[in-house]
């Protein structure tokens, strides 16, 4: 239905367009003079729908659609009757807000129409706006693209806005909001200023090296600034994987011998019946994955086949896939039957999977492991019976839920260690583009340190500074901008 409504509005302006699409090559570039309009709120029936415009004809559109005709007080809500400028027919009684540029989201004159969210109302207002000369439907992400073009947002802030729109967990929301607030951009600008000062010192020495009036230690000061920046860049690059996990999700793999309760735990954590639970060993024969929100962190939870040998070819393929997922896991939930710790399968699992991951130091591997002893409801008050020596572990009963709170708290701590704390940690690198430019900057600083020729050293500093400038959007190519803005839909 909504695509049909949008098509009607588009046809009234300049021919049909899709509701959510990449910017076409023929679309006017931001700042071309066209005024754009779009439905900015969600699709479907709702109490209030928000329709916005941006561009020089926004004030004109507001005047001819409303009564009285004068513009309302800037940035104050005003109740107005909306009418179709072609027929004079009333469309809705709505709240309108007038945002004269440059004090607006896009930096241009903007209007917001807060109308009743019925399809007929929204359709009527969109068609009315499409009939106003100089107005056309917005392309995907065009409002934000204009904000970027007009200097209201830098590129990292644009990416933060996209991440905020798509955030599904508390941690993702916090990280996206910090990036939207400009923390990563401010950090990069500070680094760029450091490089500018270092470059000024080097070029001063090149131009006035034999001048008695030149301060002593100019090159040494540049070296100190570069070394400090190398340390800072290296620290952020080491943390890059944490930011990518926070944006894309932490891979948590549940593994263990058959019938340890792996599928029951996956169902418990995901709060829905993802996996089939059966007392028959080998029920799970493939990897089942489900995205979940655990303690505010995004997680891709994988249920895997029980690890054992000497089974049929189908289950053996499931075991192979389970071991493959184990190698890819960020966090392993190792499950054992607390009432059967002395069995060969339990002892073998402890000696192989648990021991091998536990032997790794955090500096050698990003993998972490929690050992969970399930079926605690079958234990005597004294706890687990005779068996192998156990590393630190958690007791849980998937049947009764006893021990679940302790497991969730342990998971929260592990996920915070894997992803970082988006509330207090330094700004994280959430995209491969960020990592690429910081690595390029670090490589260029390495060339600076190795250069015997001061002219080549100065050029290396320029290259390093260029990477930081491009990270925040300076000198970015249209292709890169198109990739970033394709994450937005019409109206944003």
Curated annotation (Swiss-Prot):
Protein name: 5-taurinomethyluridine-[tRNA] synthase subunit GTPB3, mitochondrial
Subcellular location per the Swiss-Prot or TrEMBL entry: Mitochondrion
Outcome recorded upon mutating residue 459 to K: In COXPD23; small decrease in GTPase catalytic efficiency
UniProt GO molecular function: GTP binding; GTPase activity; tRNA 5-taurinomethyluridine synthase activity
Cofactor binding remark: Forms a homodimer in the presence of potassium.
Record-listed E.C. numbers: 3.6.1.-
Cofactor: K(+)
Binding site for 5,10-methylenetetrahydrofolate: 52, 112, 152, 492
Binding site residues for K(+): 259
Pfam family, one: MnmE_helical
PROSITE patterns membership: G_TRME
Broad enzyme group: hydrolase
GO term, biological process aspect, one: tRNA methylation
Protein family per UniProt: Belongs to the TRAFAC class TrmE-Era-EngA-EngB-Septin-like GTPase superfamily. TrmE GTPase family.
Related illness: Combined oxidative phosphorylation deficiency 23: An autosomal recessive mitochondrial disorder characterized by hypertrophic cardiomyopathy and/or neurologic symptoms with onset in early childhood. Disease features include hypertrophic cardiomyopathy, hypotonia, delayed psychomotor development, lactic acidosis, impaired activities of respiratory complexes I and IV, and defective translation of mitochondrial proteins. Disease severity is variable, ranging from death in early infancy to survival into the second decade of life.
Domain TrmE-type G: 249-416
Effect of substituting residue 315 to A: Decreased GTPase catalytic efficiency
NCBIfam families: PRK05291.1-3, small_GTP
Effect of residue 259 to A: Strong decrease in GTPase catalytic efficiency
Keyword Cytoplasm among record annotations: yes
Effect annotated for changing residue 257 to H: In COXPD23; strong decrease in GTPase catalytic efficiency
Effect on the protein of changing residue 322 to P: Decreased GTPase catalytic efficiency
Chain sites annotated for binding Mg(2+): 263, 284
């Amino acid at each position: 239905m909504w695509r049909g409504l949008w098509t009607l509005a588009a046809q009234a302006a300049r021919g049909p367009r899709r509701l959510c699409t990449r910017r076409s090559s023929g679309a006017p570039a931001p700042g071309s003079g066209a005024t754009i309009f779009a439905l900015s709120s969600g699709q479907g029936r709702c109490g209030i729908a928000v329709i916005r415009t941006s561009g020089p004809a926004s004030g004109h559109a507001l005047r001819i659609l409303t009564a009285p005709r004068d513009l309302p007080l800037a940035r104050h809500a005003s109740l107005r009757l909306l009418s179709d400028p072609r027929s004079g027919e009333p469309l809705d009684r709505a709240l309108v807000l007038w945002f004269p540029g440059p004090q607006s989201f896009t930096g241009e004159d903007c209007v917001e129409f807060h109308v009743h969210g019925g399809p007929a109302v929204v359709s009527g207002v969109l068609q009315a706006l499409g009939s106003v000369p100089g107005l056309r439907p917005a392309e995907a992400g065009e409002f934000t693209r204009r904000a970027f073009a007009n200097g209201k947002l830098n590129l990292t802030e644009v990416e933060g806005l996209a991440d905020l729109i798509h955030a599904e967990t508390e941690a993702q929301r916090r990280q996206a909001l910090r990036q939207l607030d400009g923390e990563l951009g401010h950090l990069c600008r500070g680094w760029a200023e450091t490089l500018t000062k270092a470059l000024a010192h080097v070029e001063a020495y090149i131009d006035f090296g034999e001048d008695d009036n030149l301060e002593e230690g100019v090159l040494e000061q540049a070296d100190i600034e570069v070394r400090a920046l190398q340390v800072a860049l290296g620290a952020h690059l080491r943390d890059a994987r944490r930011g990518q996990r926070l944006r894309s999700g932490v891979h948590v793999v549940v593994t263990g011998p058959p019938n340890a309760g792996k599928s029951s735990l996956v169902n418990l954590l995901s709060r829905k019946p993802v996996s089939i639970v059966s007392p028959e060993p080998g029920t799970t024969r493939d990897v089942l994955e489900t995205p979940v929100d655990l303690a505010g962190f995004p997680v891709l939870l994988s249920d895997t086949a029980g690890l054992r040998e000497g089974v049929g070819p189908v289950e053996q393929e499931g075991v192979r896939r389970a071991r493959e997922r184990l190698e890819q896991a960020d966090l392993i939930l190792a499950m054992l039957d607390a009432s059967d710790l002395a069995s060969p399968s339990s002892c073998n699992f402890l000696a192989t999977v648990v021991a091998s991951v536990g032997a790794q130091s955090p500096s050698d591997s990003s993998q972490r492991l929690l050992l969970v002893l399930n079926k605690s409801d079958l234990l005597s008050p004294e706890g687990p019976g005779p068996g192998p020596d156990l590393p630190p572990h958690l007791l849980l009963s998937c049947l009764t839920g006893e021990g679940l709170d302790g497991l969730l708290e342990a998971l929260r701590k592990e996920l915070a260690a894997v992803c970082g704390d988006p509330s207090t940690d330094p700004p994280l690198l959430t995209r491969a583009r960020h990592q690429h430019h910081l690595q390029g900057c670090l490589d260029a600083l390495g060339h600076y340190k190795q250069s015997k020729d001061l002219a080549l050293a100065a050029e290396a500093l320029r290259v390093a500074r260029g990477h930081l400038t491009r990270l925040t959007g300076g000198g970015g190519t249209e292709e890169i901008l198109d990739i970033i803005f394709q994450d937005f839909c019409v109206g944003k």
